[in-house]
Structures are given as structure tokens and as C-alpha cells.
Amino acid sequence: IEVLPLDFRKKLKDDGFKVSELIIKERNLANDGTLKLLLSTDDNESIECVGIPTEKRLTACLSSQVGCPMDCKFCATGKEGLKRSLKASEILDQILFIENEMNRKVTNIVFMGMGEPLLNIDDLLLSIRSINNDFQISQRKITVSTVAVPKMISKLSAKSFQILGNCQFTLAISLHASNQKTRETIIPSAKNYEIKNIIEDCKKFVRETGRRVSFEYLMLSGVNDKLEHAYELSNL
């Protein structure tokens, strides 16, 4: 709760009351109504979340970690490295701040903020369970975006059934390249996980969950935007 003094917030916590562990450091409102919040954690780290409004929906873009270990060359967060993973409560607090600041209910969730969600899989799934049960947001309105981590797509499927009882959210793969060589230049971690293996693990995920997998492709001028890349992409 941002308006309460720090000492009073500490006293409330000591007395057993649940008080938000995050405070707002900065607000940035775009002309189209999109709101970016810079939040400070109780250990003085910074994370971001974004509220993206349209007429009929409000999408919350959430962070899952402080920083990120993946070092993707097109992402500013990767330059910071990983500080730590967020607790489920810190993930959920981002939704509350967006709803409070924008004075409307969040309808859709995308885990596309800071961090690699599959490297914080337990708290990710615990937060999804609460988003579904407590915020009354259907899993089908939740998207988990990942650059893909070896063995973690299979683990995501298994853990989803363990923690959620099913797997109804959308998995989105940040592919961003049509061939292995290009992908390794923009996503260093790709050296450990070839595209062909990602595709096979995604096929297994679809078989196990019955849910489709989305693929994200950021076009970078002179890197992955030629016609040959489009042909390669269509043949994956």
C-alpha cells in the first residue's frame, strides 16, 4: 500500500496483516492509454509491469523475475542479468497495482515482462492458480511467453497438471529467427536448445495439454527480415 508510511507498513506486517511488498516508483502513461509502472520491491530491486487497455479488455503484462539471465540482444532487461525470481505474491501485486491505477479490472494476462517465466516455474504456476481462482480470470486468457529453456516445456506441462489440475493457458515461444545460426546471434541461450528440439517439445506439449502453441517473431532490420527468412520460417 503505497500511501502508508514504511514504519506503519512494517507494524502491520508484524501484526500479521498482509500488506503489498511493492511500491510505485514511477508511472508512465502513453497517449493510447497504456500505463507502465516501475515498482520497487521490499529489498529495493526494481521491476516493471504494463497495463494495456482497449475498449473491451485490459491486458496486464507481468514480470516474473528481477532482471533476466537469458541476455537476448534485443531486450534491455537481459543486460542487467538475473537478480532473483519473484514470489507469487509479488507477481499478483502487479495486477492489483494496474487495476488500482487504471480503475478497472484486468481481463487478460501476458507473462511478457522482465524475466524468463519458465525459470520461475513454481511461483509462475502458483500465481496463475490465484489469477484463475481469486481474480476470476480464465486460464484461456493467460499467455506465458518463453525464449525456451531445455527440458522446461515438458516440465511446464507436468507441473501445470500438478499445481493447476489442468493446462489451459497459451504457451508462446519467442522464436525470433528462422534458423539456428541467426537465433544464436540474438538469443545466446539458444546454443543449448536447437530450434528442431523446441519444435518437438512443443508438439509434445500440444499432445499432453490439447492447447495450441504460439510463436513470436520480432523482425530486426538486416537480421531476420529477408524473404529467405520467411521461406525458412514456413518450413519449420
Task: Tell what function each PLM region has.
Residues 1-58:
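Flexible, acidic/Gly-rich N-terminal and inter-domain linker regions that tether
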